[in-house]
């Protein structure tokens, strides 16, 4: 784990949008603003159960040309109407300085950078400079690939331009593996971001992780279990007619039901008995962790010696048969102890990679 990074961040409660506790802070609205009627009807449905921050895509960076790419600036007038009639804060995605200037012109309260934009430092810098001397919050989605440093770099660029109302949106990452979700949740990325930037508010975007509405509840609950601050969820008055991402959008009443189903646990407890028990268990974990590191160090020493012996006898470092045997034994042990087999494989593959590096050294 890398060292914590020092960002200057205005606390979420000082943005004027949200109030913590309770969690989650919620941003909701359609994937895309499609018509005035659709925007207003959706906003009315969301406002009815207390949603105060309304999102809608105005410009849509689509994978294929010719797909619906958003209505553009005219949609900002509909957003403006939402703000005026329902008293909701409004936010949308920006991908360049032109978008920023249009948003400022129409009184948009908050903007976010999409995953593709975050992956391009030139665009991030352009947007940061366009937002200089403004006071609107900026949320940043993680890049499409699991690159935490690239994500943190976007916050640093915003900070350098004096922007301190910043927050993260974790939307999962692209994967070539066949999984049930649209994007791999990669929760470790959000956990590591919190460790390195503890002051940064983090929202989850279960809509883009899921790809299908049937998975939204489980992903939202997981975000709460991990202590994330909020959710950005796509909601449409009639998803069957949506021009983009129809399968992952909820009608407002279903979003209300989802939010009411979430179990949100406290970050700590004042109960002395609880604290004593937790301290005792954590002390056990500390000892186990120390032993783990000692055993890993010992294993690496043995790996180095094996490497030396192989070099002396001109034997190749990697011997697939031996590694298959080691992994098979580890998986069998995992099964015996009730451990997740994929987890054990991941750990052993990381150890194997480090061992090969030691032997090559």
Label every PLM stretch briefly.
Residues 24-41, 65-69, 88-94, 114-115, ...:
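Active-site mouth loops of central-metabolism enzymes
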